[in-house]
Structures are given as C-alpha cells and as structure tokens.
Amino acid sequence: MTRVKRSIQRIIKKEFILKKAKGYKGGNSSLFKATKQTLLKAEKNAYRDRRYKQRLWNKIWITRINGLLRSYNINWSVIKFFLKNNKIKLNRHILSQVSIYDPVLLQIYILFYINTLCRI
C-alpha cells in the first residue's frame, strides 16, 4: 500500500476553519482544536436559533391576526380551519401584513367568512 501525503490538504483545511473563526476571543481564533470545537458549537446554536426565530415570528403574526379577529368574536384557529377547507393559500405572514396595513380588506374577508358560515 502506498503512502498518502496530506500536508497541503491539511493546511488548506486548517486555514479554512481558522478563517471562519476570525474575531473569536483568545485561543478560539488561533488554536485549531479549540477553534474546531467553538465552530461546532456556534453552528449548532445558529441552527437552533433559526428555528426559534421562525417560531417567534409565527407567534407574533398569529397575535396580530387575533387582535383584529377578536373584535368579530372569531379566533385564529377558526379562520385557519376555514382557509384549509376552502383551499385558500394565505399564510400567517400575509394575513398579518394585511391586518396591519389594510384592515378593511381583512374585514371584507371576515364578512365573506361569516356569510359562508350562514349558508351552511
């Protein structure tokens, strides 16, 4: 079996990882082992917090929608059920924006929903 020399690949890999850790404090930016561990933890936290941020925005959007819907004695879960059954493709973000910038349009939509319920 032939011997494999990896000096250049190893140097490139180390440089790549050390470049990612620029600005970290102490040995975390200059020592390879510490840098590798710090980057793993940073990537894990970034992944987790991206999911958390999305959950947070969903909560905010639902709260905004609910704020307007409560004045009609309707809550978000009922509207969500209505959207799904009628195959209407409006997500939380769009409905939230409409409730802030164009509440009249959302009122028309709610009246349509109430009329649909009366027909059933």
Swiss-Prot record:
Coiled coil: none annotated. GO terms for molecular function: rRNA binding; structural constituent of ribosome. GO terms for cellular component: plastid; ribonucleoprotein complex; ribosome. It comes from the Eukaryota. One of its GO terms (biological process) is translation. It is found in: Plastid. Its main location: plastid. Pfam families: Ribosomal_L20 (PF00453). Keywords: Plastid, Ribonucleoprotein, Ribosomal protein, RNA-binding, rRNA-binding. NCBIfam families: rplT_bact. HAMAP family: Ribosomal_bL20. Binds directly to 23S ribosomal RNA and is necessary for the in vitro assembly process of the 50S ribosomal subunit. It is not involved in the protein synthesizing functions of that subunit. Belongs to the bacterial ribosomal protein bL20 family. This is Large ribosomal subunit protein bL20c. It comes from Helicosporidium sp. subsp. Simulium jonesii (Green alga).
